Amino acid sequence: VICKVYTIQWDSVNYISLATLTGRVVSFTRVSQYTKHGVIDKMQRVLVAGATGYLGRFVVKELKEQGYWVRALARNPEKLNRLGVFREPPIIADEVFVGEVTKPASIQRLCDNIDIAFSSIGLTRQKDKLTYRDVDYQGNKNILDIAVESSVKKFIYVSVFNAHLYEHLEIVKAHEDFVRELQNSGLNYTIIRPTGYFSDMSEFFNMAKSGWVFLLGNGKSQINPIHGADLARVCVNAITRDDNEVSAGGPITYTGQEIAELAFAILTKTPRIIRIPSWLAQAAVKAVRPFNKQTSDLIDFFVAAGQGDAVAPKTGVNTLADYYQELVPGIRTR
């Protein structure tokens, strides 16, 4: 029996491992790990739920760069190797777990040997008649129950900024009802509250491409949206921090008017902006509700949020102008 130490290079991470050889490898045991962030004596294992979403993809990437072992939960594993529609990176995880959070039987072993659970699960454009209650609350509750049973050390969850202002809306209430479940679970936890993703701001870009941007209200409400890569760093850093809540925004604060004008400028188009009064937007919500409650709830949230500021502590380096520039060369953003 011959013992040798091998170094394997994976992306920016070196894994220092001890292999026992008898002409071929018969066991492979990790003994320590070196990354650009220093030495980690024991590689922590992290579950990422929502891995195929905008933020989740960046979280997987950041976790790997910081030297964590990653299990990615995916409903559709075929999405993992593709570049996301908002320029998110493909997913390179240590393990892929195929399951659906709304089907507890499919995720029973999800947290086996997991130290940290992260979830950015939320209802987006799914077309299977699920509700915000089904996904944002119950789906995350299903993960939490398994995390508690598996003695996970910490649970990190992405909710909504200024949620207390919008809990009368089902999309926010579902998130915050889960937050209360997490707070009462007995687990260590961190709630991440971003102001808004750059992917959300792509809607302004899409409208500008079509020639017109529609703004709710007077366009003076302020927001400092954040890039997925910058927010992912906040999420991953929360693993080793004691904060129970972290609010995060990007480095630059804009008004709605300024975001619209920026989109037109990047596209080298003449700004054409139509302002929609709040009363008219609310009328649209009521008109849509009998036919599609999910869509009306989402519009209702954006109408309410668009009437107030969403400015959180600034972090990150990525600007909305740079992000819009990436979208120019024929990239689909829907």
Please place each PLM-identified region on the residue numbering.
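Glycine-/Pro-rich loop/turn segments that contact NAD(P) or position catalytic residues
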Residues: L123-K209
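Glycine-rich Rossmann NAD(P)(H)-binding loop
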Residues: L216-S221, V246-Y254, F264-T268, I276, ...
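N-terminal Rossmann NAD(P)H-binding glycine-rich loop of SDR-like oxidoreductase domains
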Residues: V46-Y68
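Terminal hydrophobic/aromatic helix or amphipathic segment near a protein terminus
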Residues: E258-Q307
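Glycine/proline-rich active-site loop of Rossmann-fold NAD(P)-dependent oxidoreductases
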Residues: S199-N206, N237-V246, K269-P271
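Amphipathic terminal alpha-helices
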Residues: A305-R334
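NAD(P)H-binding glycine-rich loop region in Rossmannoid oxidoreductase-like domains
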Residues: E78-R82, R87-N142, I146-E149, H164
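Substrate-positioning beta->alpha
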Residues: G139, G217-I239, N244
